[in-house]
Amino acid sequence: MNLKQKYLTDVVPALMKQYGYKSIMQVPRLEKIVLNMTAGKEVTNSKAIEEVLNELTQISGQKPFQTRAKKSNASWKLREGMAMGGKVTLRRDRMWDFLEKFINVAMPRIRDFRGANPKAFDGRGNYSFGVKEEIIFPEIEFDKIRRIKGLDVQIITSVNNDKEARSLLELIGMPFSKGEK
C-alpha cells in the first residue's frame, strides 16, 4: 500500500475521530512539497548551478526552475539577478511518491538520524526539514558529484496550526524524535 492509499484509508478516519471533524473536507491534507537547493560557495560557477538543477531533477522527477539572487552581496560575490540554485514544487502523485521515498528510503540513510525535529513547524501548520547531504537519495551517484550540497524540504499542509499538522505527519509515518510534543 502506497502512502496516498494509507492516507485515504487509515489517516483520514483516524484524524476525523481524533479531532471530531464532521466532513472529510475538514481533514488536514498535504498541499505541496517544495524542494530548494543552492550552489552555496560555488554560486559564481555555472557548472555548479547546472549540477544543482540536474540533482534536483533526479531527486524530484520534475524539472526545477532556477532561483536568482534578489539582492547583491559583495562578500559572497553575488550580484542581483545571478543564478543561485533551483527550486521544485511537487503536488499530487509526485508529492506522495517523493514523500514515501523520503520517509522510507532517504531518512534512514541520514547519518546519526534520531528522528525529525518536532519543533520545525512554522506556527501555521507547515513543516521544514534541512538535509545536509543530498547523497541520501538513491538517485544521486556519489562518484558523479563534485561537492556535497544540502537540500531544504518544506511540507505545506492545509491546516493553520502545528498540532493538527504534526498529527497528520505522524500518522503518515514521519519519524519525529522523542521528546517535546
UniProtKB/Swiss-Prot annotation:
InterPro entries membership: Ribosomal_uL5, Ribosomal_uL5_bac-type, Ribosomal_uL5_C, Ribosomal_uL5_dom_sf, Ribosomal_uL5_N
Keyword annotations from UniProtKB, A to Z: Ribonucleoprotein, Ribosomal protein, RNA-binding, rRNA-binding, tRNA-binding
Disulfide bridge positions per record: none
Protein's UniProt keywords contain Secreted: no
Biological process annotations from GO: translation
Gene Ontology cellular component list: ribonucleoprotein complex; ribosome
GO molecular function annotations of the record: rRNA binding; structural constituent of ribosome; tRNA binding
Protein name in UniProt: Large ribosomal subunit protein uL5
Organism for this UniProt entry: Mycoplasmopsis agalactiae (strain NCTC 10123 / CIP 59.7 / PG2)
Lineage of the organism: Bacteria, Bacillati, Mycoplasmatota, Mycoplasmoidales, Metamycoplasmataceae
Gene: rplE
